[in-house]
Amino acid sequence: MNANLPPSAISELHGPRLLLRAWRDSDREAFAEMCADPQVMEFFPSVLDRAQSDALVDRVQAHFAERGYGPWALELPGEAAFIGFTGLFDVTMDVHFAPTVEIGWRLAPAYWGRGLAREAAETALDFAFERLRLPEVVAFTTPPNRRSWGLMERLGMRRDPAEDFDHPLLAADHPMRRHILYRVDAARWAER
């Protein structure tokens, strides 16, 4: 894996409709609104307050500075300056499939159902396999999150129920502790 790409080499990716770009300070307000929205955060342990949301943006920016990739801010040119994020995260927690790279996404509800999460994820996966030369990318979510795992399947990711896991950062009795794991490798991605 080439994790030493200069951030300038990947500060922007272009999809047919979307711009995946570096985060701006002006994104923080819209992101905080998303993270405080119970609909957006339905399958996360809790909504985030402004300080927690800003701290997440800070971690994203630090990840980019350190690794040369991360979750990009999503812009829909001509329509919206910020609609959410999609991108790549290092998985370092204590799970059987780590260390690896995860793809994740979060969009404002006004942009759901338009194929934008899929477009952004395809753009990020192209980057993961073509530029970073990753052997595999994973994604995971809670079983009730059909929208998310449905997208994983539409992306060609595959699930093996034997690999499902309990999220180590959630309490043993937390209702969202159980997670399902999807994978796609470079060869499968190239075949699509």
Curated annotation (Swiss-Prot):
Task: Show the Pfam families listed in the entry.
Answer: Acetyltransf_3
Tell me where on the tree of life, at the top rank, the source sits: Bacteria
Membrane spanning residue stretches: none
Domain N-acetyltransferase: start-end pairs: 18-187
Q: Which UniProt keywords apply?
A: Acyltransferase, Transferase
Which EC class is this protein assigned?
transferase
Q: Does the keyword Acyltransferase apply?
A: yes
GO molecular function terms attached to this record: acyltransferase activity, transferring groups other than amino-acyl groups
Residues binding CoA are 105-107, 113, 145, 150-152
UniProt keyword Acyltransferase, yes or no: yes
Q: What is its EC number?
A: 2.3.1.-
* Cross-referenced InterPro entries: Acyl_CoA_acyltransferase (IPR016181), GNAT_dom (IPR000182), N-acetyltransferase (IPR051531)
Function in brief: Catalyzes the transfer of an acetyl group from acetyl coenzyme A (AcCoA) to an acceptor substrate and releases both CoA and the acetylated product. It prefers the peptide Asp-Phe methyl ester (or aspartame) and the peptide antibiotics polymyxin B and colistin. Other substrates like dopamine, serotonin, puromycin, chloramphenicol, D-glucosamine, glycine and N-alpha-acetyl-L-glutamine are used and displayed lower activity.
What protein is this chain from? Acetyltransferase PA3944
Native species of this protein? Answer: Pseudomonas aeruginosa (strain ATCC 15692 / DSM 22644 / CIP 104116 / JCM 14847 / LMG 12228 / 1C / PRS 101 / PAO1)
